[in-house]
Amino acid sequence: MSFLANEASSESIASFSKPEIMSSFLPEGGCYELLSVIGKGFEDLMTVNSRYKPTGEYVTVRRINLEACSNEMVTFLQGELHVSKLFSHPNIVPYRATFIADNELWAVTSFMAYGSAKDLIGTHFMDGMSELAIAYILQGVLKALDYIHHMGYVHRSVKASHILISTDGKVYLSGLRSNLSMISHGQRQRAVHDFPKYSIKVLPWLSPEVLQQNLQGYDAKSDIYSVGITACELANGHVPFKDMPATQMLLEKLNGTVPCLLDTSTIPAEELTMSPSRSIANPGLNDSLAAGSLRPANGDSPSHPYHRTFSPHFHNFVEQCLQRNPDARPNASTLLNHSFFKQIKRRASEALPELLRPVTPITSFEGSQSQDHSGILGLVTNLEDLEVDDWEF
């Protein structure tokens, strides 16, 4: 059944997209100059880099063809728009406007000029980011999760591609469409049992109790497990359990396989002297140390990409997040006071741009003059390298 054939659903979606509900941008398609398609997803979802004409600001417009939406997807979108209306936090991606344009739902957000954390490790930090950069990023994520959990929701999709970084180095958590309320009939439930829809892309990050789908269910502590997996993803340059069949992944997690940070304290010394292709792959830790690239310099023997040492505080932080028993995991508020974050001395907006060098925000490719078309072309070219189809605003 097409979306427009379902009048009740159409009216419900439209009610969430009235201008008084979302913030500051005009809810009119003519106000946006669509520059380039930078991502496509399921259900005819299209992400377009755009310019908001009244101010010249770059924005991201997510366009969803409502005629192609299934009824299940309509329900999914209604939940996402409801949460977007409900939440207001400096570390959660805000909607600037949502509205219906012809047969499409348009959702407008500020453009994140550094892209996602996944973009960064995929293009510049293939062997992982610095510990301090990760501390700043995860602090922003945990602040967002602490708010979400206090609002009675479970996020269920914490991963690097849902961590966005703005031009000024601010960290935002996205992926709100996967959020699930733990409130039922006015009461907060001790556990929920719903398995995330469209979850195939988030399986490596899901906790054992979510994957197990048993009568015990899961709660907000499942997000903490995902934070631990994301910490490994940012530090190692790839997510644990990557490309592992779902059944094997479940068995590894249920049997207590715990991913870790890859450095001199977790990799045997003899492996650090081998080329990555000879290193032993440990399921759950990394698919293959060959994922790291060697960097020879001046003809010298190449060093192993994981010949580094993370602090004991960082290792302990990850261990706390990845405990098999969810009751043993700290909550987001407690983790924000973990010793791992003591190294943070400045605001993320002041420190992250320096820590992410030589990466520059994409808006820096824009010319100084508004009619500099070469600057626009450079911006569009660099946008095409981003994996924005994974950004779920």
UniProtKB/Swiss-Prot annotation:
UniProt-listed GO biological process terms: activation of protein kinase activity; G1 to G0 transition; protein export from nucleus
Phosphothreonine sites (modified residues): T381
Primary site of residence: nucleus
InterPro entries: Kinase-like_dom_sf (IPR011009), Prot_kinase_dom (IPR000719), STRAD_A/B-like (IPR047173)
Boundaries of every Protein kinase domain copy: 32-341
Record localization: Nucleus; Cytoplasm
GO cellular component, one term: nucleus
Residues with the Phosphoserine modification: S2, S9
Keyword set, alphabetical order: Cell cycle, Cytoplasm, Nucleus, Phosphoprotein
Reported tissue expression: Expressed in liver.
Signal sequence bounds: none
GO MF annotations in UniProt: ATP binding; kinase binding; protein kinase activator activity; protein serine/threonine kinase activator activity; protein-containing complex binding
Protein role: Pseudokinase which, in complex with CAB39/MO25 (CAB39/MO25alpha or CAB39L/MO25beta), binds to and activates STK11/LKB1. Adopts a closed conformation typical of active protein kinases and binds STK11/LKB1 as a pseudosubstrate, promoting conformational change of STK11/LKB1 in an active conformation.
Domain observations: The protein kinase domain is predicted to be catalytically inactive.
Similarity section: Belongs to the protein kinase superfamily. STE Ser/Thr protein kinase family. STE20 subfamily.
Assembly information from the UniProt record: Component of a trimeric complex composed of STK11/LKB1, STRAD (STRADA or STRADB) and CAB39/MO25 (CAB39/MO25alpha or CAB39L/MO25beta): the complex tethers STK11/LKB1 in the cytoplasm and stimulates its catalytic activity.
The name this protein goes by in its record: STE20-related kinase adapter protein alpha
Organism: Rattus norvegicus
